[in-house]
Amino acid sequence: MPAYSTVRVGKKYSPSFKVYVTQDGKIVSPFHDIPLYMSGNREIVSVVNEIPRFENGKFEINKEEAFNPIKQDIKKGWPRFVKNVFPMKGYLWNYGALPQTWENPHEVDRHTGARGDNDPLDVIEIGRKRKEVGEVYQAKVLGSIALVDEGECDWKVVVIDVNDEKAKEINDIEDVRKVYEGLLEQTIFWFKNYKVPDGKPKNNFALDGKYMDKKFTVGIIKSAYENWCGMINSKSDTNICKENSTLMDKVDSPAIIQEDLSDEEVPECVHQFEFIK
C-alpha cells in the first residue's frame, strides 16, 4: 500500500479544524484518490479513519471542499459532539469510510427500500489499536448492518485491520461474536440510541436488524464502488467536490502547512453519561 500521511490545520474541536490526507507530500482526496481495492482480493479494502475509538467529536470527510479534508461536523454553528450513551464512551470503534464508494441518494437500495445518504460507505473497525483522524489502512471485510437514519439507507461495514493481532481469528461476522462477545449487540444499541440525548427519535434498522455476512457485504461494497464510478464521471451531483490528484481532470494539489495548535476546549457533555430507557 502507498504511504499516506496527514496535514493538520487549525485547532481540533473548532470550526477551522481540517485534516488533509497526503501521499508523497502531495495533498490527495480521501474520497476519490485512495484506491478502494489495492489488490484483486475484494475482501480486503482501504479504509480512511475519521473518528478514533472513544472520541466524541463527529469528524467526517467533507464532500464539498476541494480535496475533501476531514472536518468536524457543524450543527447550528457549533462543532458537533456525540453524547456518551451509558456505559459507552464516545464511539465504540474506529469509525471511518471506504474511499471510492458512494451511497446514491437518487436510487432506492434494493435490500432496504431506502435511498442512499449521499456519503461514502461507513466503516466500524473493531481492532485493538486506536487509529488517528485521517489514518489510512487495509482491512478485512467481516459483515455489515443496514441502519436507516432519518429515512436514508446508511450501511455500516464491519472490518478489522489486516495487521491487527486478532485478524487471523476473525474472518466473518460470526467470528466477531466468538472473539468479542457482546460487541455486536452493543453496536446495535449505540446506533439505535446515540441521537436520543439530542432530542431525536431512535434510529431503525432494515433487514430486521440482522448482521449480514462477508459475502453479502462484499456485494454491497461493489455496488457502492460502481455508484462512485458513475458519480465521478458524471457532471451532475455538483454538491460533491471531485477535485483530485490521481484521476481525470487533474488539478494542482494545494500547498498546506501543518499547524501544531492546542486543542479547543470541549463541552461538558463529553465528560458525562446519558442514560437511555
Curated annotation (Swiss-Prot):
The keyword Zinc does not apply. Its cofactor is Mg(2+). GO terms for cellular component: cytoplasm. InterPro entries: Pyrophosphatase (IPR008162), Pyrophosphatase_sf (IPR036649). Gene3D superfamilies: Inorganic pyrophosphatase (3.90.80.10). GO terms for molecular function: inorganic diphosphate phosphatase activity; magnesium ion binding. Mg(2+) 2 binds at D122. GO terms for biological process: phosphate-containing compound metabolic process. It catalyses: diphosphate + H2O = 2 phosphate + H(+). Its EC number is 3.6.1.1. Keywords: Cytoplasm, Hydrolase, Magnesium, Metal-binding, Stress response. Diphosphate binds at R80. It is an enzyme of class 3 (hydrolase). Mg(2+) 1 binds at D117, D122, D154. It is found in: Cytoplasm. It holds the Pfam family Pyrophosphatase. Involved in osmoadaptation. Belongs to the PPase family. This is Inorganic pyrophosphatase. It comes from Encephalitozoon cuniculi (strain GB-M1) (Microsporidian parasite). The lineage of its organism: Eukaryota, Fungi, Fungi incertae sedis, Microsporidia, Unikaryonidae. The gene is IPP1.
